[in-house]
Amino acid sequence: MALGLEDKKAIVAEVNEAAKGALSAVVADSRGVTVGEMTGLRRAAREAGVYVKVVRNTLVKRAVAGTDFECLSDTFTGPTLIAFSNEHPGAAARLLKDFATAQEKFEIKAAAFEGEVIPAADIDRLAKLPTYDEALAQLMMTMKEASAGKFVRLLAALRDQKEEAA
C-alpha cells in the first residue's frame, strides 16, 4: 500500500521524536517473523520501555538525521525494524537479543549508543549493561564487602596488639 506524503511526514516526525529522547537504538531484520511473534515482541517492548517500529529505509534515514543515531544509516538496507531504548540504554539490545535467540530468522544488524555504532557481534556489550537498580545493588555490595574487610583487619590488628602486650 502506497503512503501519501503526509503519512510519510508523520512517520518521519514520530520516529525522529523517538530518536531524540532515546538512549540507544538497535536495528534488526524481521524477515520471516510471523505477525503473532511480532505482536509478542511489541508487547514485551512496551513493558520494557522500548519503542519498536518497522519503517522504510528512506524514511528512517530522514528521521535519524541530526541525531546520535545517524551513524546507523549504512545499516538501513532490506526490511528494517528499529528499536529505541527510552529508560535504560541496554533495554532494546537485551529485548531484541532474547527475541533473536528464540526466533532463528530474526537478525540483529547493529546498534548505536552515544553516537557509536556497535556491530551485531558485539551487541552483548550493550545488552549486559546493568539496570539502575542492579548497578546500585552492586555498589552497595562492594561498599558492604569493603567495610567488612576493614572490620576483620581491625580485629586482627587488635588481636596482634594484645598478643604483643601479653
UniProtKB/Swiss-Prot annotation:
CDD domains: Ribosomal_L10. It comes from the Bacteria. Transmembrane segments: none annotated. Pfam families: Ribosomal_L10. PROSITE patterns: RIBOSOMAL_L10. InterPro entries: Ribosomal_uL10, Ribosomal_uL10-like_sf, Ribosomal_uL10_bac, Ribosomal_uL10_bac_type, Ribosomal_uL10_CS_bac. The keyword rRNA-binding applies. GO terms for molecular function: large ribosomal subunit rRNA binding; structural constituent of ribosome. GO terms for cellular component: large ribosomal subunit. Part of the ribosomal stalk of the 50S ribosomal subunit. The N-terminus interacts with L11 and the large rRNA to form the base of the stalk. The C-terminus forms an elongated spine to which L12 dimers bind in a sequential fashion forming a multimeric L10(L12)X complex. Forms part of the ribosomal stalk, playing a central role in the interaction of the ribosome with GTP-bound translation factors. HAMAP family: Ribosomal_uL10. This is Large ribosomal subunit protein uL10. It comes from Shewanella woodyi (strain ATCC 51908 / MS32). The lineage of its organism: Bacteria, Pseudomonadati, Pseudomonadota, Gammaproteobacteria, Alteromonadales.
